[in-house]
Amino acid sequence: MVRELERKQLGADFPQTAPAANPVFFRTYSRRQQIEGTRESWSEVCDRTLKGLVELGKLTQDEALLLEEMQRNLKALPSGRWLWVGGTNWLAQPKNFSGAYNCTSTNVIDWSAFGLMMDLAMMGCGTGAILEPKYINQLPSIRNRLNVKVVGDIGKTIANERREFTETKIEGNQATIYVGDSRDGWVQSYQTLLELSTDERF
């Protein structure tokens, strides 16, 4: 016997002229709540993001009220990135500030630029590389052929044995990279591979 279960439909008061607004909002900007199976409503997203903007901009009460009126009435909105991360504890950490930007661009002049672009991408910030000759001609020449070998199985290290940061050990002409299981760890391991490709010690 098939029984129809009542499904509670989530929705926000978006204009009927914007039929894709609800699915886009709940897919992209509404964060999961502590209670399993629930997501932020439009009102809760407004509460979170407006609070974050007021704190960040040190806004006056009049400025805050104007922003609130504009956002809640869908007359003006912050960036899409801000709708997702604005007002969160994650964004309050200085190392994550760039995650509030929709996009950035980076002059590719050294290997740290590649690390920066990976870090930005892992934060969800769109990042572009400026590859003009005046920049990329500053990159060091590749001089070492790397033979990369993965040791161990991905995902098999138990949680309390995982490292947060990447560590590199060099013995003779062999480098062992212990990849930290974090954004910083992955960025550092990627940048280390690039640096090893031009390292004059080898």
Feature locations, PLM:
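Extended catalytic cores of very large enzyme megasubunits
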Residues: 1-202
